[in-house]
Structure formats: C-alpha cells, structure tokens
Amino acid sequence: QAQAGAVISEITEAEAGYVTSGAAAALMLGTAACVTGLDPGKMNRLPNTDGMKNEVIIPRSHRNFYDHAIRSVGVKLVEVGVSDRFSGAGVRDTEAWEIADAITNRTAAIAYIANANAHPPLMEVVDVSQKHGVPIIVDAAAQLPPASNLKKFTALGADLVCFSGGKAIRGPQASGFLCGRRDLISAAALQHLDQDTLFELWDPPRSLIDKNVLPGAPQHGIGRPCKV
C-alpha cells in the first residue's frame, strides 16, 4: 500500500494515496478517518459514534444511493438546501452559506458529489470547510476522463477525493483509490489493514502510518471487510 500510495500521490499531486476496493469503499474509509482521526479508541468503537463528531453535511441535491457507504460508518447525514432547479419549481439549489450554517461541534465532514451540474461550486464549499476546519470528502468516482481531474479536486482544496478504478481507468470493478491529506489517509489505512500484530513488533512504512504518534494499534477496523 505504501508503494502504491506513492504512485497515487504522484499522479494526483495529493499528500498521500491509498488503494481501495472501489470508490464506495473509499467513501467509507474516508468518512471513518474524518470521524476518528488517529485515535485508536475511536476506531475501535465504530460504528458506535456516541460522543464523537458523527454528522456529515451534504447538499440535498447530492444525495445518492452510494452515500450508504458514508452512513455505514455510523454517522448521520445532515441534508441542507432545497434543490428547486431539479423539481422544476424554481432555479435555486443549496448555497454555500447554508452549509456553513449547518456546521456544529458534531460535524465530522462535508460530503460533495462532483459532477458538471454540482452546486454550490466546489471552491465555495472548500472556502466554508477551511474557514470552519471541517474536512471535505469529494466523491469523484465517475469524473474520469479527463485525466486532469486526477489533480483538480485536490488542487481546489479537497481534503479527501474518492475515485473508481473500474470505470475509465479500466481496472478491476472492485478497485478504486482515496487520495488527500496524509493524516486522513493514515487514519483510513489503520481502519483497513490487518491489525493482528503486537504493537512492539509492528513496523508499518512511515510514509503510510507514523507509529510514533499512536498510543497503540487499533483492532481490526470498520473497513477491514473492504480489504484488497
């Protein structure tokens, strides 16, 4: 994973990357990472999120069948805005200020589904996320081609980006990858990899997981069923 992550990091220009068993698995692992950070105790408690940041804000027009992967972590989706433009009743959709207004001390992340019709514009949502210190997860599963999108969302300020490996990349259908902030990729990896090892003997690649910042190793994480 560390070697593959280095390749993903190079092609996406993100801090780090990680191979997953599809974009939905990337959504699940990314959400878990945003909820727990690098806290093994929180990792062990998922999907019980009592006492944690356990809400993910999503524009109402971004809801889709795949957001079940987000909810599977144990978080609640907080829908904001009204998508009048899709109902034919008007021209408005969710606006960035509505996302900001929904942020509380329970907000773990903001979910954003990238496509040509997505609203509000990603840059506006990134401004909100950075102002409030809330990570944004971009689902870019079907946003290839163009190849430039491999770098676009990270360059715009997304904390995590999920891609499918089974569409235009033409890899196995059960493949994908997650890229973004190094600390969040590490948190995702910790909840995905086999943890059946003694902490004192465990020697993960530091480029993927910095053992020195951990009080101990978590148990098998919520993402273990998504192993590759």
Regions found by a protein language model. Give the residues of each.
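A glycine-/small-polar-enriched, mobile loop at the entrance of the PLP active site in fold-type I
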Residues: Q1-A2
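Conserved PLP-enzyme active-site core in the AAT-like
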Residues: G5, E13-V19, A23-V228
